[in-house]
Amino acid sequence: MSTDYSSPAYLQKVDKYWRAANYLSVGQLYLKDNPLLQRPLKASDVKVHPIGHWGTIAGQNFIYAHLNRVINKYGLKMFYVEGPGHGGQVMVSNSYLDGTYTDIYPEITQDVEGMQKLFKQFSFPGGVASHAAPETPGSIHEGGELGYSISHGVGAILDNPDEIAAVVVGDGESETGPLATSWQSTKFINPINDGAVLPILNLNGFKISNPTIFGRTSDEKIKQYFESMNWEPIFVEGDDPEKVHPALAKAMDEAVEKIKAIQKNARENDDATLPVWPMIVFRAPKGWTGPKSWDGDKIEGSFRAHQIPIPVDQTDMEHADALVDWLESYQPKELFNEDGSLKDDIKEIIPTGDARMAANPITNGGVDPKALNLPNFRDYAVDTSKHGANVKQDMIVWSDYLRDVIKKNPDNFRLFGPDETMSNRLYGVFETTNRQWMEDIHPDSDQYEAPAGRVLDAQLSEHQAEGWLEGYVLTGRHGLFASYEAFLRVVDSMLTQHFKWLRKANELDWRKKYPSLNIIAASTVFQQDHNGYTHQDPGALTHLAEKKPEYIREYLPADANSLLAVGDVIFRSQEKINYVVTSKHPRQQWFSIEEAKQLVDNGLGIIDWASTDQGSEPDIVFAAAGTEPTLETLAAIQLLHDSFPDMKIRFVNVVDILKLRSPEKDPRGLSDAEFDHYFTKDKPVVFAFHGYEDLVRDIFFDRHNHNLHVHGYRENGDITTPFDVRVMNQMDRFDLAKSAIAAQPAMENTGAAFVQDMDNMLAKHNAYIRDAGTDLPEVNDWQWKGLK
């Protein structure tokens, strides 16, 4: 017997389900005992500090109930992304009703005792968060920081052609920059190879204490707005459930059938033209089904519904009857049996097994997660038999490796960026793939654009690139986001949120592992001579270093072979944010592929061919982390050795900067004995660093050796020559060499003439670039001679 999913009888069950979800959601806000009000409510039943939000809840529960309906009707593989920031009860309540919550947390049983635990734990010490945190079944998006819901949904459905991301977007959230630009995602979803996103704009009209822009915008203008971005909005509006249920059911059916028609046409006819995707605009009051007013002020349909709408807590029970009336308005006796279990007629309409949105495998590590099939990075090695003689562009070399990663992993590896793949010299990838771009293509003026491709960089938005990558890796696939170093700061808060997700998810036994999030910082601070001061900011290194060390890796490979070795490590890793600072410009190549591998595996190494201490106690230790720091340090060592051949110099190259931290701060950190092996206990260390200097000072603070002289980025920059950026920050060879002399008191007299020579060279540099517009021949043509 077929089911009529639009019949009044079926929709009545949907209404009961919705009321049950609302009841659970209110109970989680206020109660810690007596969950079904089976006795009179007393103070000890109520939380001391009810914490959470109400305004978005009933609208989202309504949407969730109707998504369950279309899952049943059409046999969908669908998952839920909760964009509105403050609605943690939604996914908890619905996953509890469908049984997923109890499957994962068996102590939260589907009875009175389990319901009591469910209520008490919400926004409670030792309990669960008030957002859709990693503890929440079915969530890949916490929603604490607003704006990324559509980006995450799109990233998740890329290369998942059978999946639909039901993304609920708050009308307040839609005012954020990242969300506003993410509506353009239609231009990047290929209906042949990818799944679909069904955005549902939860238009309740208010934010914390202001109206929303969409809330005061007519349907006609909203329609025009979304149509301009290839969405077809379907409008549903009302506050009477008897009318809104059939209206939303009809709208959901229409949306799903349009999605299916788009995909059927595309897949059967190989038609990859840009479709017009459906979306739903759902207007219902903020705080729907809650208190209408309080103390003469409007609650439902106003900003006042945002958080805790009525003042009831354990210490103030004056208005407890209002809370009881609110809870009983959902008629819990029609919804739950006396033992707290859900009534059978409601259970009948809930999807089962993996069809439950909270149990969809995509939301827990992916549908079919696979490790990458990686080529042997050694096959791409650059010849360094004569150190520094070979000049290559690291990113071009690496792009050949990435090209073959794509070939070997055609369905689960992607590159993301904000229109910078070519600028960052990843040319090789386009030998095997294109940029995914669903808009019109003009062959005479476009390059590498196609409806299908493994590169998504055709939207100039760091937020989109980062959000897509996050959605992609949180659903079990692999990729990287390459961008200009300075403008990765645009998304450093997103990186923080991703770290927080990883940390919490890793603490849950039931959460599967995620591939790492790989961030490539190119066009770096000491290479931004042509774009100038605005493009010079290495601060993401410091920002990420402040996070829990188990989840953060920072690599500063000095040449192409080091970058190849780093790539092999990051693509095999899990549950990390790998931040790689690398070069795209022509540069001398230093380390053999085996040297590079050892440097990456150990994090650092003493470079024998650039050291003269022969394993004995050095007079001076030079350390370098980064491309320009390595070049300038080697040049400084050459200058010193030529003038002071008896000076015992040790050169330490650092690739994994955080490996230098104390094991008290970082489990991977070098022991004091290991640290002293490289840096000694008291000899002067001249450390050339790619980033802000305090990161290195912080590392040395816990160590024996405080005889440290750091040369990093000192917030000096301009449009000038490449070498002059280093001079401005005293991270050049002449200043490094001077620092080495100044750090050795015994050299005060014998080194005076040398220091003067260095000052003369700096003066010559300053005069020359202002006349010639380029760097000194002594700089541009410098070659490593070796240490005899």
Curated annotation (Swiss-Prot):
| Catalysed reactions, semicolon-separated | D-xylulose 5-phosphate + phosphate = acetyl phosphate + D-glyceraldehyde 3-phosphate + H2O
InterPro entries, per the entry: Phosphoketolase (IPR023962), THDP-binding (IPR029061), Transketo_C/PFOR_II (IPR009014), Xul5P/Fru6P_PKetolase (IPR005593), Xul5P/Fru6P_PKetolase_C (IPR018969), Xul5P/Fru6P_PKetolase_CS (IPR019790), Xul5P/Fru6P_PKetolase_N (IPR018970), Xul5P/Fru6P_PKetolase_ThDP_BS (IPR019789)
- Stored Gene3D superfamilies: 3.40.50.920, 3.40.50.970
**What is one Gene Ontology biological process annotated in the Swiss-Prot or TrEMBL record?**
carbohydrate metabolic process
Provide the E.C. number(s) assigned to this enzyme: 4.1.2.9
**Could you tell me what induces this protein?**
Induced by sugars that are fermented by the phosphoketolase pathway (PKP) and repressed by glucose mediated by carbon catabolite protein A and by the mannose phosphoenolpyruvate phosphotransferase system.
Keywords, A to Z, come to: Lyase, Thiamine pyrophosphate
Q: Which cofactors?
A: thiamine diphosphate
State a single Gene Ontology molecular function: phosphoketolase activity
> Which superkingdom is the protein from?
Bacteria
Spell out the subunit comment.
Answer: Homohexamer.
The family assignment reads: Belongs to the XFP family.
The name on file for this protein is Xylulose-5-phosphate phosphoketolase
Organism field: Lactiplantibacillus pentosus (Lactobacillus pentosus)
**Gene designation:** xpkA
